[in-house]
Amino acid sequence: MEMQSEFDRLLFFEHARKSAETTYAQNPLDADNLTRWGGALLELSQFQPVAESKQMISDATSKLEEALTVNPEKHDALWCLGNAHTSHVFLTPDMDEAKVYFEKATQCFQQAFDADPSNDLYRKSLEVTAKAPELHMEIHRHGPMQQTMAAEPSTSTSTKSSKKTKSSDLKYDIFGWVILAVGIVAWVGFAKSNMPPPPPPPPQ
């Protein structure tokens, strides 16, 4: 059932991406559409291997920056861009490189919160980002995320294995939180648009 749900999400956001691409060809200055496009790419990135995921996150970043060029005060685009930088952080083992993304994410979340202080999600994003460097170190303590994500069992002591599992759990908690939040924005964005939603999955 969970696999079916994941597949439905994949189909939905692929549909969203293609629809946004079509709309962009008709109106490249639609900031709402660019934001939805970036959000859909960010969602789809979690279904890809690490290298492809990084590229998709970069594409999402490009679309969100384009949206902000059209409308610099668009706080939902700022927030999504912060999530894109955060996603990039946890796929980047090098702390110096990751620090650049940390700073960009914090700046985006702060600007989004300043533009809409009543938005609880923006406030929580700022709080989580403040803890992100510590979580990043925990995740990459045993090597790059590619290794952390590997399914093969550890041949080291049970203590190290436990720590590795904890790191993996942390990674999925963080990445899952980011993706879930972006997914909510994308769903709401498409609900507000005139585009009919994709057909519901057949009853189980």
UniProtKB/Swiss-Prot annotation:
**Where does this protein reside within or beyond the cell?**
Mitochondrion outer membrane
Annotated membrane topology: Single-pass membrane protein
Enumerate the Mitochondrial intermembrane topological stretches.
Answer: 191-204
Q: Which residues lie on this side of the membrane: Cytoplasmic?
A: 1-169
Keyword Membrane on entry:
yes
Name of the gene: TOM20
Q: Which windows of the sequence hold TPR repeats? A: 86-119
The UniProt annotation puts the region (Disordered) at 144-164
Q: Which domain of life is it from?
A: Eukaryota
Segments passing through the bilayer: 170-190
Organism per entry: Solanum tuberosum (Potato)
Post-translation changes: The N-terminus is blocked.
Question: Partners and quaternary state?
Answer: Forms part of the preprotein translocase complex of the outer mitochondrial membrane (TOM complex).
Which family does the record assign? Belongs to the Tom20 family.
Q: Which GO terms describe its cellular component?
A: mitochondrial outer membrane translocase complex
Protein name in the entry? Mitochondrial import receptor subunit TOM20
User: What InterPro entries is this protein classified in?
Assistant: TOM20_imprt_rcpt (IPR010547), TPR-like_helical_dom_sf (IPR011990)
